[in-house]
Design a protein with these regions (language model features):
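Glycine-rich, positively charged N-terminal anion/phosphate-binding segment
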Residues: 38-55
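Short glycine-biased active-site loop of nucleotidyltransferases that positions the nucleotide triphosphate
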Residues: 106
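Alpha-helix capping/helix-boundary segments
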Residues: 100-101
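Surface-exposed amphipathic alpha-helical tracts and adjacent flexible/coil segments at the periphery
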Residues: 2-22, 27-29, 34, 53, ...
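Gly/Gly-Pro- and Ser/Thr-rich, intrinsically disordered tail segments characteristic of DNA damage-repair
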Residues: 77, 111-123
Length: 410
C-alpha cells in the first residue's frame, strides 16, 4: 500500500485555520507572537494557540508552529518560555531554521518534534543527516532543489527522517528566503519576519557612470520587475513529487486570504485523493480541480526548480496578482428554500454564483428573489458590505459554502 502523503496548509489566523482543516489539510502551520517569519498576519497568542491546537486535534489533524527566524543574541532570553508555552498549548512540532534555536528547543521542550525550515537551506543529504543526528524529525528542502536532488536526499537518509517540499505559493528571489534587500532599503529584517517584499517593486537599470540614463531591460517604458518571481504550482506533478520521496506537500501563504487558503487546500486535497485512489505515472488532475488554480489570487505560475535550473521563473511585467474571481458571500443559514448569506462583495438579482463546498465539485446557483434581511425588503442588488441577504434556492447548501463570481471582463 502506498504511503499517505501529508497536505500541509498555512493559517494566518483562526478563520484561515478552520478553513484549512475543513477543506482538507492534514496539518496546518501557524505563527506565534514571536520568532516567526511573518510578523504581519494576525498570528496566534498563547490562548489562541491553545484553542487552535484543540480544534485541529479534534479533527484528527496536526499543528506546527513556526520558530524559523534567525534571532539575535539579545532575543534568545525570551525563547525558552515561548517554546514551553507552545508545548503546553499542544503544538505537534516546531519549524526551526537556526541551530541555536534547535539546541534551545531540545532543552526547553524535548518531546516536541523539530522540523528544519527551508530557511536552513538544506540542499544535500549530508546536511539532512546532520540535522537528523541533532534530533530533527523532518527537513523542509530548499526551494532551489530539483526533484532528482530531493530523491538523492531521500535515498541517502534514514526513512525515519521525513522530507517536506513546497508545492505551491510565492517564491523568494533570494536563496531559501535569505534576503537583505528589505533590511537595507527600509530597515525591515526579512530574516526576522518583517519582509517588506521590495522584490515586488518596479525597477529601472542605471549604469553608475551615466546617472539619469535608464536602460531598458524589457520592452516597457515604465520599468521592469526584475526581481519578481512567479508563483510555484506543482499540482500537475503529484506522481513526480511522490516518486522523489516527499512525505509532506507544503503550501505557502500564511499572509494570504481565507479564501485563498480554502481554495488552494481544497484543490490539492482533491488532486491528491484522486491520485492515491488510482496511482499512475500518467495521472492527470481532474479538469475542474485544475480550473480552481485560476479562481484564487495568484501570480503567473511556474514549476520553479523542480525540473532543473529555473529558466522562466520571473514575471517581468507586473508585481501584482491575477485576480479573476470575487468572493460574493459566505453561508450564514438556510431556512427551507431560503439561503441566508453574509455579503462580502456585491452581487445582483439574476447573477449566477458558483458555490464551493468541502470535498465537492463546485456548482452554480442563480440569485432569485433577493431580500435584504435587515428590513425584509426585496432588492435588485446586494451592495452593502457585510450586510445579511437571502435568496431562493432549490437545494441544500453546506454550512461551509463559499459563494463566488467571476469578475466581469471590461
Amino acid at each position: 500500500m502506498m504511503k499517505r502523503v501529508e497536505l500541509l496548509s498555512p493559517a494566518g489566523d483562526m478563520e484561515r485555520l478552520e478553513l484549512a482543516v475543513k477543506f482538507g489539510a492534514d496539518a496546518v502551520y501557524v505563527g506565534g507572537t514571536q520568532f516567526g517569519m511573518r510578523s504581519n498576519p494576525s498570528n496566534f497568542d498563547p490562548a489562541q494557540l491553545q484553542a487552535a491546537c484543540k480544534l485541529v486535534h479534534a479533527a484528527g489533524k496536526k499543528l506546527y508552529l513556526t520558530c524559523n527566524t534567525l534571532p539575535r543574541s539579545y532575543e534568545l532570553d525570551a525563547l525558552p518560555d515561548f517554546l514551553r508555552s507552545a508545548r503546553a498549548a499542544g503544538v505537534d512540532a516546531f519549524i526551526i531554521a537556526d541551530m541555536g534555536v534547535l539546541a534551545i528547543a531540545k532543552q526547553a521542550a524535548p518531546e516536541v518534534e523539530v522540523h528544519i525550515s527551508t530557511q536552513a537551506g538544506i540542499v544535500n543529504y549530508a546536511a539532512a543527516n546532520a540535522f537528523y543526528q541533532m534530533g530533527a524529525k523532518r527537513i523542509v528542502t530548499a526551494r532551489e532543489l530539483s526533484l532528482d536532488e530531493i530523491k538523492m536526499i531521500r535515498d541517502h537518509t534514514p526513512p525515519e527522517l521525513e522530507i517536506e517540499a513546497f508545492v505551491h505559493g510565492a517564491m523568494c528571489m533570494s536563496f531559501s528566503g535569505r534576503c537583505i534587500l528589505s533590511d537595507y532599503m527600509v530597515g525591515r529584517d526579512a530574516n526576522r519576519g518583517d519582509c517588506a517584499q521590495p522584490c515586488r517593486w518596479k525597477y529601472h537599470l542605471m549604469e553608475e557612470t551615466r546617472p539619469g540614463q535608464y536602460f531598458p531591460i524589457n520592452q516597457e517604458e515604465n520599468g521592469t520587475y526584475i526581481f519578481n518571481s512567479k508563483d510555484l504550482c506543482m499540482i500537475e506533478h503529484i506522481p513526480e513529487l511522490v516518486a522523489a520521496g516527499a512525505d509532506s506537500f507544503k503550501i505557502e501563504g500564511r499572509a494570504k486570504s481565507a479564501y485563498y487558503t480554502a481554495v488552494v487546500t481544497h484543490a490539492y486535497r482533491q488532486a491528491m485523493d484522486a491520485y492515491f485512489a488510482h496511482p499512475s505515472p500518467d495521472f492527470r488532475v481532474p479538469d475542474w480541480v485544475l480550473a480552481e488554480m485560476e479562481k484564487m489570487s495568484h501570480r503567473v505560475y511556474t514549476t520553479g526548480f523542480n525540473f532543473g535550473p529555473l529558466q522562466n521563473g520571473q514575471e517581468l511585467n507586473t508585481g501584482g496578482y491575477v485576480r479573476n474571481w470575487d468572493v460574493c458571500a459566505l453561508y450564514r443559514d438556510q431556512q427551507g428554500n431560503r439561503l441566508i448569506v453574509d455579503q462580502r462583495n456585491r452581487f445582483f438579482e439574476g447573477d449566477v454564483l458558483e458555490v464551493l463546498e468541502p470535498g465537492q465539485k463546485p456548482y452554480t446557483l442563480t440569485v432569485r428573489d433577493l431580500v435584504r434581511e435587515a428590513d425584509g425588503t426585496r432588492t435588485e442588488a446586494a451592495n452593502k458590505a457585510t450586510e445579511v441577504y437571502s435568496f431562493a434556492v432549490d437545494r441544500p447548501v453546506s454550512p461551509d459554502a463559499i459563494l463566488r463570481r467571476k469578475r466581469d471582463e471590461d
